[in-house]
Amino acid sequence: PMFHANAWALPYSCALVGTKMVFPGYQLDGKSLFELFETERVTVSAGVPTVWLALLQHMGQNKLKFSTMNRTVIGGSACPPAMIRSFQEDYGVQVLHAWGMTEMSPLGTVSTLKSKHLDLPKDSKLAIQSKQGRSIFGVDLKIVDDAGKDLPWDGKAFGNLLVRGPWISNGYFKGEGGDPMRKDEDGMEWFPTGDVATIDPDGYMQITDRSKDVIKSGGEWISSIDLENAAVAHPAVAEAAVIGIRHPKWDERPLLIVVKKKDSQVTREELIKFFDGKVAKWWMPDDVVFVEQLPHTATGKLLKTKLREDFKDYKLPTA
């Protein structure tokens, strides 16, 4: 019951309102999911991007449409904008992007549009939906630099994300790992999430990386998530991961690791060129590697520790 944020607390909230719950069990392939959704007439779903990737690929290859599903909550890891667009424009499914942690019991933020956003162009709305969103009642957020100094809510500065609230953990079982809490200059205690994020003037938070996954190049930070999101927008890319590879001059440089869609072809040069205009020049990957599959945790997140181990001796062409 305590596995992965206790199923996002859905067993409790659904029971409270008398909602039927449908569980897929171990059959998380696209075909099985689609058949389950249709048979059980699912209207609302919740899951991680990796699961929805398999579902959307199956539906796209077989030209299928949902008959009942109209909303989905996506969390667990950052949802690529291309996935949100596909759900909404190709299948008429409204996406709610959310973020939280088991330590937060579990919900922290939800990305819903404010009234002033409703008349914005589609791309502008998508940019807002792609953020993890605003904090729910009872949860406070802030971002700080490595010295603990508060950073501005300007949507540009990114730093270590801290949270606090009445139902947020202040430690671990039997004190494992020591006291995680951070005190600010006013003596307030904050829980460090391990995420790096920005917060815009409207309070929308966006995860740019896990602190351990940020690529530190020439003294600056590069977001692996932003690069992955840009890569999966390419029509030939099924899934992508970006890790930092040691570089003699820049300390680290990004390596893009790609799984191609079935029967699709794309070259290293085409993918690197695809980043033109989407990210800063110095963010662009130094190299691309194609693989059959990427490693994932039991909860569907990319297992970057395994990728870093597999590619620890990789030599970049720019090194």
Which stretches of residues belong to each language-model region?
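Conserved AMP-binding/adenylation subdomain of ANL enzymes
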Residues: 3-43, 58, 113
